[in-house]
Amino acid sequence: MSTDPDEREVSPALTVGDGDVDVSLRPRSLREFIGQPRVREQLQLVIQGAKNRGGTPDHILLSGPPGLGKTSLAVIIAAELGSSLRMTSGPALERAGDLAAMLSNLVEHDVLFIDEIHRIARPAEEMLYLAMEDFRVDVVVGKGPGATSIPLDVAPFTLVGATTRSGALTGPLRDRFGFTAHMDFYEPAELERVLVRSAGILGIQLGADAGAEIARRSRGTPRIANRLLRRVRDFAEVRADGVITRDVAKAALAVYDVDELGLDRLDRAVLSALTRSFSGGPVGVSTLAVAVGEEASTVEEVCEPFLVRAGMVARTPRGRVATALAWTHLGMTPPAGANQPGLFE
């Protein structure tokens, strides 16, 4: 039976249950934002420079894996500029007219945030080029030989685009961003600070050791850390005295199948199939997906990125291979002659 990727507690994607809580935990200034020190410093310079000049900053592209705070930074950028924020997403802009309507309603210094900007439809993207560069759009009226193009001015604005796949952006769109910031995964110590702040806002009693325990299982992602904190809170309120200690956190995360490295049932199923059924590989992702009863896209896009980053799975030209760390994590010994990724694979 296949698993809905968004139902996993360790999914970095925004789920329905995250929505309202995610907003309440969102930092309101660069000073409050935890982690990403290099990005924060760069943004502070971009924002302050624009404020000193009394103009709008360059268009800003935020790239990086999901759950690291790109939307939060967009909200902060608008707040730091004292500007209104208009939010939309790439998939919502299917036609050029959708974008034209939004651009025509902007006022000077507004911030327009487009999430998943790599998924914007081509007609809307081509209209965006002109709006970003010249602050105008050409609206086509009529059809066929009688169609005419009417230029419309757009108030000077700042576009903040967010993407998890910067390589999927077309060159012309990427080149129109004056500043690009790449966000990296968080260190456990940074996630501990995120958890302490979130616990304070949510009124959760969180022990220091408990924060460290949750942080190291959060895959370097604040969104996952906050979600696990809420699950542990539920456990503490129902089965303990409401106080989250390290033992309570460990017991709660065991209930939700999140192990000490942040792997869940699906991750371990992939590793188990790779080691037990295929002797460590190499094996193709489609075959591996059949072995665990999942779609190949789920294994490749949901499980594999973290397993590769954690050093448990290696991608080679011949297929996926379990590393020594994967065998160790499962408490197994690699059989003699087990395949290991070569130096140049």
Swiss-Prot record:
Q: Name the keywords, alphabetized.
A: ATP-binding, Cytoplasm, DNA damage, DNA recombination, DNA repair, DNA-binding, Hydrolase, Nucleotide-binding
User: Mind telling me which InterPro entries this protein's record contains?
Assistant: AAA+_ATPase (IPR003593), AAA_lid_4 (IPR041445), DNA_helicase_Holl-junc_RuvB (IPR004605), P-loop_NTPase (IPR027417), RuvB-like_N (IPR008824), RuvB_C (IPR008823), WH-like_DNA-bd_sf (IPR036388), WH_DNA-bd_sf (IPR036390)
Q: Where does DNA bind?
A: 315, 320
- Read off the CDD domains from this record: AAA (cd00009)
According to the record, the residues making up region (Head domain (RuvB-H)) are 260-345
| Main location, first listed in the record | cytoplasm
Swiss-Prot/TrEMBL domain comment: Has 3 domains, the large (RuvB-L) and small ATPase (RuvB-S) domains and the C-terminal head (RuvB-H) domain. The head domain binds DNA, while the ATPase domains jointly bind ATP, ADP or are empty depending on the state of the subunit in the translocation cycle. During a single DNA translocation step the structure of each domain remains the same, but their relative positions change.
Q: Which protein, by its recorded name, is this?
A: Holliday junction branch migration complex subunit RuvB
